[in-house]
A protein has these predicted regions:
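Phosphate-handling catalytic cores of nucleic-acid transaction enzymes
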Residues: 1-192
Length: 192
Protein backbone atom coordinates (compact mmCIF):
# COMPACT_ATOMS: atom_id res chain seq x y z
CA UNK A 1 0.00 0.00 0.00
CA UNK A 2 1.44 3.35 -1.01
CA UNK A 3 0.78 6.73 0.58
CA UNK A 4 -2.22 8.70 -0.69
CA UNK A 5 -1.99 11.43 -3.28
CA UNK A 6 -3.40 14.87 -2.52
CA UNK A 7 -4.70 16.75 -5.57
CA UNK A 8 -5.60 20.41 -5.26
CA UNK A 9 -8.39 21.67 -7.52
CA UNK A 10 -8.21 18.72 -9.93
CA UNK A 11 -9.56 18.93 -13.48
CA UNK A 12 -10.45 15.99 -15.66
CA UNK A 13 -11.26 15.85 -19.33
CA UNK A 14 -12.39 12.57 -20.84
CA UNK A 15 -12.84 11.75 -24.48
CA UNK A 16 -14.43 8.38 -25.10
CA UNK A 17 -14.75 7.27 -28.70
CA UNK A 18 -16.68 4.05 -29.12
CA UNK A 19 -18.74 2.46 -31.84
CA UNK A 20 -22.54 2.94 -31.66
CA UNK A 21 -23.19 -0.77 -31.14
CA UNK A 22 -20.85 -0.91 -28.15
CA UNK A 23 -22.48 2.20 -26.68
CA UNK A 24 -26.02 0.87 -27.04
CA UNK A 25 -25.25 -2.63 -25.79
CA UNK A 26 -23.15 -1.35 -22.90
CA UNK A 27 -25.04 1.72 -21.75
CA UNK A 28 -28.51 1.68 -23.24
CA UNK A 29 -29.70 -1.80 -22.34
CA UNK A 30 -28.79 -3.60 -19.15
CA UNK A 31 -27.00 -0.70 -17.47
CA UNK A 32 -29.21 2.10 -18.74
CA UNK A 33 -31.04 2.83 -15.49
CA UNK A 34 -27.88 2.70 -13.37
CA UNK A 35 -26.07 5.04 -15.74
CA UNK A 36 -29.05 7.39 -15.94
CA UNK A 37 -29.97 7.54 -12.25
CA UNK A 38 -26.34 7.96 -11.18
CA UNK A 39 -26.06 11.04 -13.39
CA UNK A 40 -23.05 9.54 -15.16
CA UNK A 41 -24.22 10.31 -18.70
CA UNK A 42 -25.38 13.77 -17.69
CA UNK A 43 -21.79 14.76 -16.98
CA UNK A 44 -20.70 14.26 -20.58
CA UNK A 45 -21.24 16.18 -23.78
CA UNK A 46 -22.19 13.25 -25.97
CA UNK A 47 -22.46 13.22 -29.74
CA UNK A 48 -22.43 11.03 -32.79
CA UNK A 49 -21.66 13.20 -35.82
CA UNK A 50 -22.77 12.01 -39.23
CA UNK A 51 -20.13 9.76 -40.75
CA UNK A 52 -18.08 11.13 -43.61
CA UNK A 53 -16.83 7.70 -44.67
CA UNK A 54 -16.93 7.34 -48.41
CA UNK A 55 -16.56 11.08 -49.01
CA UNK A 56 -13.04 11.73 -47.72
CA UNK A 57 -11.33 11.59 -51.09
CA UNK A 58 -8.03 13.48 -51.18
CA UNK A 59 -6.96 15.18 -54.37
CA UNK A 60 -4.20 17.69 -54.90
CA UNK A 61 -6.79 20.48 -54.98
CA UNK A 62 -8.70 19.82 -51.78
CA UNK A 63 -6.03 18.87 -49.24
CA UNK A 64 -4.41 21.50 -47.09
CA UNK A 65 -2.73 21.30 -43.73
CA UNK A 66 -3.24 25.05 -43.17
CA UNK A 67 -5.99 24.66 -40.56
CA UNK A 68 -4.23 21.82 -38.79
CA UNK A 69 -1.14 24.01 -38.48
CA UNK A 70 -3.22 26.92 -37.10
CA UNK A 71 -4.89 24.56 -34.62
CA UNK A 72 -1.54 23.10 -33.51
CA UNK A 73 -0.12 26.60 -33.06
CA UNK A 74 -3.08 27.70 -30.92
CA UNK A 75 -2.93 24.56 -28.76
CA UNK A 76 0.78 25.16 -28.15
CA UNK A 77 0.04 28.79 -27.19
CA UNK A 78 -2.57 27.59 -24.71
CA UNK A 79 -0.14 25.10 -23.19
CA UNK A 80 2.51 27.82 -22.84
CA UNK A 81 -0.04 30.19 -21.25
CA UNK A 82 -1.09 27.50 -18.80
CA UNK A 83 2.49 26.77 -17.78
CA UNK A 84 3.21 30.49 -17.35
CA UNK A 85 0.23 30.90 -15.01
CA UNK A 86 1.82 28.50 -12.49
CA UNK A 87 -1.48 27.25 -11.14
CA UNK A 88 -3.21 30.63 -11.03
CA UNK A 89 -6.81 30.52 -12.17
CA UNK A 90 -8.42 33.02 -14.49
CA UNK A 91 -12.03 33.77 -13.64
CA UNK A 92 -14.26 34.65 -16.59
CA UNK A 93 -17.45 36.67 -16.34
CA UNK A 94 -20.35 37.28 -18.67
CA UNK A 95 -20.97 40.82 -19.89
CA UNK A 96 -24.39 42.09 -18.70
CA UNK A 97 -25.95 41.24 -22.09
CA UNK A 98 -24.34 37.79 -22.13
CA UNK A 99 -25.55 37.19 -18.56
CA UNK A 100 -29.09 37.95 -19.76
CA UNK A 101 -28.70 35.38 -22.56
CA UNK A 102 -27.58 32.79 -19.99
CA UNK A 103 -30.43 33.63 -17.59
CA UNK A 104 -33.03 33.42 -20.36
CA UNK A 105 -31.62 30.07 -21.46
CA UNK A 106 -31.54 28.72 -17.91
CA UNK A 107 -35.14 29.79 -17.30
CA UNK A 108 -36.32 28.32 -20.60
CA UNK A 109 -34.75 24.94 -19.88
CA UNK A 110 -35.91 24.96 -16.25
CA UNK A 111 -39.50 25.67 -17.29
CA UNK A 112 -39.49 22.48 -19.39
CA UNK A 113 -38.30 20.11 -16.64
CA UNK A 114 -41.41 19.79 -14.50
CA UNK A 115 -44.66 17.87 -14.67
CA UNK A 116 -45.46 17.17 -18.29
CA UNK A 117 -42.65 19.35 -19.64
CA UNK A 118 -40.84 18.16 -22.77
CA UNK A 119 -37.58 17.67 -20.82
CA UNK A 120 -39.07 15.66 -17.93
CA UNK A 121 -37.50 12.41 -19.23
CA UNK A 122 -33.98 13.83 -19.28
CA UNK A 123 -33.98 16.02 -16.16
CA UNK A 124 -30.60 14.66 -15.10
CA UNK A 125 -29.02 16.18 -18.21
CA UNK A 126 -31.20 19.21 -18.87
CA UNK A 127 -30.69 20.51 -15.33
CA UNK A 128 -26.97 20.83 -16.10
CA UNK A 129 -27.37 22.25 -19.61
CA UNK A 130 -27.16 25.95 -18.70
CA UNK A 131 -23.94 25.20 -16.81
CA UNK A 132 -22.61 23.56 -19.98
CA UNK A 133 -23.62 26.65 -21.94
CA UNK A 134 -21.53 28.81 -19.59
CA UNK A 135 -18.54 26.47 -19.78
CA UNK A 136 -18.71 26.25 -23.56
CA UNK A 137 -18.93 30.04 -23.83
CA UNK A 138 -15.90 30.30 -21.55
CA UNK A 139 -13.95 27.85 -23.68
CA UNK A 140 -14.83 29.72 -26.87
CA UNK A 141 -13.86 33.02 -25.22
CA UNK A 142 -10.49 31.66 -24.14
CA UNK A 143 -9.71 29.73 -27.33
CA UNK A 144 -10.40 32.78 -29.49
CA UNK A 145 -8.21 35.00 -27.27
CA UNK A 146 -11.04 37.38 -26.44
CA UNK A 147 -10.28 40.00 -23.81
CA UNK A 148 -12.57 41.19 -21.03
CA UNK A 149 -15.95 39.68 -20.28
CA UNK A 150 -17.65 37.00 -22.35
CA UNK A 151 -19.52 38.78 -25.15
CA UNK A 152 -23.17 38.26 -26.12
CA UNK A 153 -22.02 36.70 -29.41
CA UNK A 154 -19.86 34.16 -27.60
CA UNK A 155 -22.67 33.44 -25.11
CA UNK A 156 -25.00 32.76 -28.05
CA UNK A 157 -22.46 30.40 -29.59
CA UNK A 158 -22.14 28.61 -26.23
CA UNK A 159 -25.94 28.35 -26.08
CA UNK A 160 -26.13 26.92 -29.60
CA UNK A 161 -23.50 24.31 -28.75
CA UNK A 162 -25.30 23.43 -25.49
CA UNK A 163 -28.55 22.99 -27.44
CA UNK A 164 -26.84 20.79 -30.02
CA UNK A 165 -25.22 18.61 -27.35
CA UNK A 166 -28.53 18.45 -25.46
CA UNK A 167 -30.32 17.21 -28.55
CA UNK A 168 -27.57 14.67 -29.15
CA UNK A 169 -27.90 13.48 -25.55
CA UNK A 170 -31.63 12.93 -25.96
CA UNK A 171 -31.17 11.17 -29.29
CA UNK A 172 -28.34 8.92 -28.10
CA UNK A 173 -29.83 8.03 -24.73
CA UNK A 174 -33.13 6.93 -26.24
CA UNK A 175 -32.85 3.85 -28.48
CA UNK A 176 -36.23 4.68 -30.04
CA UNK A 177 -34.90 7.91 -31.50
CA UNK A 178 -31.41 6.70 -32.36
CA UNK A 179 -30.89 7.34 -36.07
CA UNK A 180 -34.52 8.41 -36.51
CA UNK A 181 -34.45 11.93 -37.93
CA UNK A 182 -38.22 12.40 -38.06
CA UNK A 183 -38.60 11.62 -34.38
CA UNK A 184 -35.53 13.67 -33.47
CA UNK A 185 -37.17 16.83 -34.72
CA UNK A 186 -39.95 16.48 -32.14
CA UNK A 187 -37.48 16.05 -29.27
CA UNK A 188 -35.60 19.34 -29.56
CA UNK A 189 -34.16 20.67 -26.32
CA UNK A 190 -35.04 24.19 -27.38
CA UNK A 191 -37.42 24.51 -30.34
CA UNK A 192 -36.12 26.63 -33.19
Amino acid sequence: SSPGINLKEPRLTISVMIQPDVYHKGFCTRKKEIVKTSGHHARFLMCQPTSTQGTRIITGDNYSSQYQELFDKRINELIDESLAMSGERRCLHFSPQAARIWTDYYNDVESKLGGLGPLRHCREYAAKNAEYMARLAGLLHHLSSEEGDISPYTAEMGRELAIWYGNEYMRLSNPLTFDNTAQNETMRLIPE
